[in-house]
Swiss-Prot record:
Organism name: Schizosaccharomyces pombe (strain 972 / ATCC 24843)
Keyword field: Hydrolase, Phosphoprotein, Protease, Thiol protease, Ubl conjugation pathway
Modified residues (Phosphothreonine): T112, T115, T721
Catalytic activity, as annotated: Thiol-dependent hydrolysis of ester, thioester, amide, peptide and isopeptide bonds formed by the C-terminal Gly of ubiquitin (a 76-residue protein attached to proteins as an intracellular targeting signal)
Entry GO CC: cytoplasm; cytosol
One Pfam family linked to the record: RPT
Phosphoserine: modified positions: S113, S722
Protein known as: Probable ubiquitin carboxyl-terminal hydrolase 2
PANTHER family: UBIQUITIN CARBOXYL-TERMINAL HYDROLASE, UBIQUITIN CARBOXYL-TERMINAL HYDROLASE 2-RELATED
Any Gene Ontology biological process: negative regulation of ERAD pathway
InterPro entries to which the protein is assigned, alphabetical: Papain-like_cys_pep_sf (IPR038765), Peptidase_C19_UCH (IPR001394), UBP14-like (IPR044635), UCH_repeat_domain (IPR025305), USP_CS (IPR018200), USP_dom (IPR028889)
GO molecular function: cysteine-type deubiquitinase activity; K63-linked deubiquitinase activity; metal-dependent deubiquitinase activity; proteasome binding
Active site, renumbered: C623, H1076
EC number(s) stated in the UniProt entry for this protein: 3.4.19.12
Length: 1141
């Protein structure tokens, strides 16, 4: 703890009010946070009963309900009432909140008295002033005027004796009895009335004290009453048996008036204290309503409005309903526990500025408050103070301890600078993995000692990383991450800090001695001074190093063996790499060579072939967009609509500046349409390259990427002018205006006849089906051979593309899909071409991808009601580490009970219309509430080549009702069986199941047979029998579960009216915040699966697609299925070199 030197704490209004409940005179306690701060006083305002004066909010008296002590508060302001609202941006706190400092010179009491009265009260005064609000607060305390002993004797005299309590009879037997003495409430109420008449009405008449008279019945008699009346300036006359005012012949002095005023309010406190309606039924209404002083103090002292961090505390403070103990740290800063962080900072800065000798004390208080709250705001404040050399005592203590030294206090330091450095370097040698923390400790000592030598040393030797683990942590990867992935992640981190990313890779490259990472550094123009050492290797040593005995292993299996070996022994990565390289050279393996150079197995075709799709190059972490473009390209009607956009675009939106259209239930503005049209033209350009290029891969344009990923801002949509080309002089537009658009009234009929056409189509031969598809005539050149330029509707500058921070980041794939489909749907008009038998394609996108859901709610108050919703994808959640796709879909369509507030409703979901292409998104990115961070679920989802949706489609005729009931009943039975198994196999705190526990207990009981413990000799047998019972029941439950699952799996085998075939599998490898995307697509025509991995498109074995991915972070995040009767619209290979000019 820091050394304290006469603290002078500036107090907030809240703190000062709290302290008035504790202290009652000038003392050290006001500025001692560690002194007892328990509440002693509970103030109420003096009563104004019978007075006509208006309450003065700047000058008022209070009396304590506990001690009957008095508090006089006077507030002076130079410029009116200070603002007390919470500070806003650009308006300083100092202009709104008073900070009160105690004045050294105390004011004199404000009572003048010509003569000293034997009943005069003692008083003490204090004064505080606030420069921030130019206000002063003066407080005077006065002791209780009424003699405490006298009051005690009166109270004691009214208490019934023990004997009277024993002889007292029930009022039900002898009627109500009246005590010979008046109640205490009556006594104090009557006395208050006498004083009120004197003070308010100047009533100076004598008061008769005749036996059994009014005074005796209401006040009492005896020595104590006479003494009390004397203090109230009434003298008892024996001869006349009355009380005569002692001030009848002269006006009251100021001191007498004040004393009687104080006495009157003390009598009110006493009367309220002894008010008991049960003992005295005559008491009904309270003549003295209590007004607590807290609201008046809050108003007078300028308590601000603020967002309390402890609302319960604030409520109690404002209501003054209970004692509020405060932490010494808050007291040290002159605040209360509920002040928000911004106020904490303000008062902390005030204390430092006005009490520089005790800065460390206030820093300690701030550190303690941060430890209580753990807020980033206070953490940053502490960090900023650290840069100014202000460090808390506990941090200094910990810093010295870290270096193996005892903490010291200046200015006479026991350790020399050389000793400090010696301890620092010793600590680094002992714990190099904690280098950063140890350096921070040295810096802390430098600040504490105000040593420029230490601080300059720390600054001059600063590095981005001090351990390789820090490099891994900054990149957000694990130590076993492959070299190629390390380089990929580093490229992503370039956007945050390219220099730091390079430094991180250097650390990892040197720790692994990785040639891949050294080459990466060289490619970025940052070669490392270190180079990978050459490891001598021959063929025999290479196989032995990898632990491979079968030299006939294929290249891909050998690469997997190498990968596992590096993961298990990363410190040997260089030797293992040399072994794989040696084997690759001996085999002349193109696959191994490619893997060592690029870190993947995707070998591009050596020569572009018309039988192979073209890949898309990835230059900015846009692999997910590449996957999406390839997916849309293989859907023939969508591809044709885009390629023939000149014929299919919405001319009305081009020609009519006021035109609008609806997409997805919302209005599309003209600027949105023109932007979408430009996107479709850019996509057409890329599609043409995918068809005509002789290269194995092509590069998507930056404009296409920008338009696909970056939506219009709200301001751009409202303005309607951003980047829109002037179409009035467009030659292309004038040509379009000559065309006419025919709206086909039979569109609905064609859509309804879709199924019939499909049946007719299946009767055709493959050759006939192929001939029915016309080759697109691309408008690439006119009759004169001149190149035709692509029309421009929306201008995107290079500056816009380069300045877009989102362009190179991995976006949410679902958002990207929605944005791309929205632009395609917005740009297309009615399509007259029905060659793919999709009907009148007024809404091609919706016909392909959209279905309709029906949600039904059933509750007691409103009965059954339904609503419908269009969907383009279904999101399925992951419930277990392993599940089937049907299990995941069950979670979407299962009937559940939902809370509707006042009642519970049953909700069911079904499909009324199915899309041609069904898109299922697997919800892999989830949120960890403990860490507050997103994470990726790698749970395995088992899916097949086929998917039947019959069980999820609306059962309109009720024929499937019994089957559906059985389906869901089986699921509930399976869950009950699983719960029972879980109960039997639940582990205890030592991770032992009930069977293990019983087994150990049985062995222990058997070993105790010869001991003196009173153990039943049959206990081991009993326990073993119980073990057998548990094992037998678990086996039975597992068999039952397997049987029910088997029945449930095949329950709908004969229901295939709504059957789908697997079309595409979108895969993500990595974590929630980074990774790589690729897609598997099923080529139905050639019956192969291809892997679309950026520029590499390769045929893969289907086992790679359907493999169990448990424990692997490369897994599907979206599955798409196509209805069996529409497989003909998928054309994966569409190449034609002759179209290239």
């Amino acid at each position: 703890m820091a050394t304290v030197k006469n603290l002078r704490i500036g107090k907030s209004p809240n703190r000062l009010i709290q302290d008035l409940d504790v202290f009652d005179s000038p003392s050290a306690g006001w500025n001692d946070p560690w002194s007892p701060h328990s509440s002693r006083y509970h103030w109420q305002l003096h009563s104004n009963l019978g007075e006509s004066a208006v309450f003065d909010e700047n000058d008022f008296w209070c009396v304590c309900q506990k001690t009957r002590k008095h508090l006089h508060v006077k507030v002076r302001r130079d410029r009116g009432k200070p603002l007390i609202e919470e500070p806003e941006e650009n308006y300083g706190i100092k202009d709104r909140i008073p900070v009160y400092y105690e004045e050294e010179e105390l004011p004199e009491p404000h009572v003048t008295s010509p003569t000293k009265s034997e009943f005069a009260t003692t008083s003490t005064c204090m004064k505080w002033s606030s420069k921030t609000t130019k206000s002063e607060i003066e407080v005077e305390w006065r002791d209780s005027y009424l003699d405490a002993n006298c009051i005690k004797e009166i109270i004691d005299s009214r208490r019934p004796s023990f004997a009277s309590l024993l002889t007292k009879k029930s009022s039900s037997h002898q009627g109500s009895s009246h005590s010979s003495q008046p109640s205490l409430f009556t006594t104090f109420t009557s006395l208050e009335l006498f004083l009120r008449n004197v003070l308010v009405h100047n009533d100076q008449r004598a008061i008769s004290a005749a036996p059994e008279g009014t005074f005796e019945r209401h006040v009492g008699k005896g020595r104590q009453i006479q003494s009390l009346m004397k203090s109230l300036l009434f003298e008892y006359h024996h001869e006349n048996v009355n009380y005569v005012p002692t001030i009848a012949d002269a006006p009251l002095t100021d001191e007498q008036k004040l004393n009687l005023y104080l006495a009157r309010n003390e009598l009110i406190v006493l009367a309220n204290h002894f008010r008991d309606t049960k003992e005295d039924p005559a008491i009904v209404a309270n003549p003295f309503p209590v007004r607590l002083a807290r609201p008046a103090l809050i108003n007078a002292f300028g308590v601000p409005n603020y967002d309390s961090v402890v609302p319960m505390y604030t409520t109690v403070f404002r209501d003054n309903s209970a004692s509020l103990p405060d932490d010494p740290a808050f007291i040290a800063l002159g605040i209360t526990n509920d002040y928000p962080d911004s106020f904490v900072r303000y008062f902390y800065e005030e204390q430092k500025k006005n009490d520089e000798a005790n800065v460390r004390v206030y820093a300690d208080a701030l550190a303690h408050i941060y430890n209580l709250r753990k807020s980033s705001f206070l953490r940053d404040l502490i960090a900023a103070d650290r840069k100014n050399g202000i460090v808390s005592s506990d941090v200094i203590q910990a810093a010295y301890s870290s270096l193996g030294l005892e903490a010291e206090v200046g200015p006479d330091y026991r350790y020399s600078q050389e000793k400090i450095f010696e301890a620092f370097h010793s600590a680094l040698l002992r714990k190099p993995e904690f280098a950063r923390a140890i350096r921070n400790d040295l810096e802390t000592i430098g600040y504490a000692r105000k040593s420029s030598e230490i601080l300059n040393y720390v600054l001059s030797t600063e590095q981005a990383f001090y351990t390789v683990n820090e490099a891994y942590q900054w990149l957000g990867i694990k130590s076993n991450t492959e070299d190629a992935m390390v380089a990929s992640v580093a490229l992503v981190k370039f956007e945050d800090d390219s220099d730091k990313a390079i430094e991180a890779v250097k650390w990892i490259a040197e720790e692994r001695n990785s040639s891949i990472l050294y080459d990466f550094l060289a490619s970025q123009g940052r070669p490392s001074n270190k180079k990978p050492k050459e490891v001598p290797m021959d063929e025999d040593l290479a196989y032995n190093t990898l632990g491979v005995q079968d030299r006939a292993l294929s290249d891909d299996v050998l690469i997997n063996v190498y990968g596992f070996a590096v993961e298990d022994h990363p410190e040997q990565s260089d030797t293992l790499r040399a072994a794989l390289k040696c084997i690759g050279e001996v085999r002349n393996s193109r696959l191994i060579t490619h893997y060592l150079e690029h870190g993947n197995l995707d070998i591009p075709p050596e020569v572009s072939s018309l039988d192979t799709p073209i890949g898309l190059e990835n230059t900015g972490n846009l692999c997910y967009l590449n996957s999406l473009i390839q997916y849309y390209f293989i859907i023939k009607p969508l591809r044709n609509a885009i390629l023939d956009i000149d014929e299919n675009k919405d001319l009305n939106m081009i020609e009519n500046k006021e035109a609008v259209k609806k997409v997805g239930g919302r209005i599309v503005t003209r600027i949105e349409f023109l932007r979408a049209l430009q996107f479709t033209y850019e996509l057409r350009k890329l599609f043409i390259e995918l068809i005509t290029s002789k290269s194995s891969s092509v590069h998507p344009s930056s404009v296409l990427t920008y338009l696909a990923l970056i939506p219009l801002t709200l301001d751009q949509v409202k303005s309607g002018t951003s980047s829109v080309m002037d179409l009035s002089s467009s030659r292309e537009l004038s040509n379009l205006n000559e065309r006419s658009i025919t709206i086909d009234p039979r569109a609905e009929e064609q859509a309804q006849g879709l199924e019939q056409e499909q049946g007719q189509d299946e009767a055709k031969s493959p050759a006939e089906q192929s001939s029915s598809v016309n080759l697109i005539d691309f408008p690439m050149a006119n009759t004169n051979g001149e190149s035709q330029t692509q029309p421009h509707y929306f201008e995107v500058s290079e500056e816009e593309i380069n300045s877009s921070m989102d362009l190179g980041r991995q976006q949410d794939v679902l958002e990207c899909i929605d944005h791309v489909l929205f632009q395609l749907e917005a740009s297309l008009g009615r399509i007259s071409n029905s060659e793919d038998r999709l009907g009148s394609d007024n809404d091609l996108i919706r016909r392909l991808f959209s279905g309709k859901l029906k949600q039904t709610l059933n509750d007691a108050s409103q009965g059954v009601r339904s609503n419908y919703e269009i969907f383009s994808h279904l999101i399925v959640d992951l419930f277990e580490e392993k599940q089937t796709l049907y299990d995941a879909l069950d979670g979407v369509f299962e009937t559940v009970n939902i809370d509707m507030g006042s009642e519970t409703a049953q909700r069911s979901l079904c499909i009324t219309e199915l899309p041609i292409i069904l898109q299922l998104q697997i919800q892999r990115v989830q949120f960890d509430r403990t860490t507050g961070q997103p994470f990726k679920s790698n749970a395995f989802v088992e899916f097949g080549k086929e998917l039947s949706m019959d069980r999820y489609v609306e059962d309109t005729d009720g024929k499937m009702a019994p089957l559906l009931q059985r389906y869901w009943d089986l699921k509930r039975e399976i869950i009950n069986l699983q719960k029972r198994q879980q109960l039997l196999l639940t582990t205890n705190s030592n991770l032992m199941s009930s069977v293990d526990t019983l087994s150990i207990l049985s062995k222990w009981a058997a070993q105790q047979q010869d001991s003196r413990l009173p153990i039943n000799p049959k206990l081991p047998d009993i326990l073993q029998e119980e073990i057998n019972n548990v094992v037998a029941e678990v086996d039975m439950l597992k068999k039952q579960e397997a049987s029910l699952k088997e029945e449930r799996t095949h329950l709908f085998d004969n229901y295939i009216s709504h059957s789908y075939d697997l079309l595409a599998v979108f895969v993500h490898r990595g974590q929630a915040s980074f990774g790589h995307y690729w897609t598997y697509i099923h080529d139905f025509e050639n019956n192969v699966y291809r892997k679309y991995n950026d520029e590499y498109v390769t045929v893969v074995d289907e086992s790679e697609i359907f493999a169990d991915t448990t424990g692997n972070n490369a897994n599907p995040y979206m599955l798409t299925y196509i209805r069996k009767e529409y497989r003909h619209i998928i054309e994966c290979v569409h190449r034609e070199h002759n179209l290239l000019l």
